[in-house]
């Protein structure tokens, strides 16, 4: 399993992370009309790559992560930038509810498959989303476990049909999914392609 605190300092040096975020941001902007007064939350924001790419589109983005070193890197990047819209936040939404504010948009990329209870976290997303807001989740399509390999205790991607059912059960009305990126990773059997979907749900 990935130790995100140890990975934080070298995270941005892997170009695939930026390439993936660019593809997700592009697909999102093609499918959703974002208004400049909207605020957003990025769940499992890591070092904030996606939020930095989308900062100019929102009034503010709260970058939430439960790994303290990831949040430290985020803060350093914010301090070194001219952006006043990005707000790093150390918080674990899998363990407690967040009642400080509500959001017009919730973003998450490659974080959901690390969360043990998918239904609980989707319900918490719904609870902090404003009416007419949207949830955008980018994650792995269902795979055979080779993406993370032996010892990983999260989800081996998601069957999008089943995930859409969880969304609707939580209260989301419209749910649409597209493949937005492909990652290639080396496995013991050689290079393998892993599709990444972007699911957008509105309440």
Regions found by a protein language model. Name each.
Residues 104-117:
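A short SAM/SAH-binding and catalytic strip from SAM-dependent methyltransferases
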Residues 1-35, 50, 73, 80, 134-162:
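Conserved class I S-adenosyl-L-methionine
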Residues 119-131:
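A short glycine-rich, Lys/Arg-flanked "PGG" loop and its adjoining helix->strand segment in the class I
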Residues 94-106:
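A short acidic, Gly/Pro-enriched loop at the edge of an enzyme's catalytic core
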Residues 41-96:
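Class I SAM-dependent methyltransferase SAM/SAH-binding core
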Residues 183-203:
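Core SAM-dependent methyltransferase catalytic element
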Residues 156-174:
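Short alpha-helix
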């Amino acid at each position: 399993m990935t130790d995100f605190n140890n990975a934080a300092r070298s995270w941005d040096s892997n170009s695939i992370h930026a390439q993936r975020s660019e593809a997700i941001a592009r697909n999102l902007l093609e499918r959703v009309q974002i208004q400049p007064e909207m605020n957003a939350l990025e769940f499992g924001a890591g070092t904030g790559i996606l939020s930095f790419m989308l900062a100019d589109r929102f009034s503010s983005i709260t970058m939430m992560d439960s790994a303290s070193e990831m949040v430290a890197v985020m803060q350093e990047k914010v301090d070194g930038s001219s952006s006043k819209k990005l707000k790093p936040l150390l918080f674990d939404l899998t363990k407690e509810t967040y009642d400080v504010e509500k959001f017009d948009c919730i973003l998450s990329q490659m974080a959901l498959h690390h969360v043990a209870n998918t239904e609980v976290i989707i319900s918490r997303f719904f609870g902090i989303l404003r009416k007419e807001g949207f949830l955008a989740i980018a994650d792995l399509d269902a795979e055979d476990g080779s993406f993370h390999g032996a010892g990983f205790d999260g989800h081996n991607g998601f069957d999008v049909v089943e995930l859409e059912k969880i969304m609707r059960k939580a209260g989301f009305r419209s749910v649409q999914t597209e493949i937005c990126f492909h990652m290639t990773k080396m496995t013991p059997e050689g290079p393998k392609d892993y599709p990444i979907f972007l699911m957008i749900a509105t309440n």
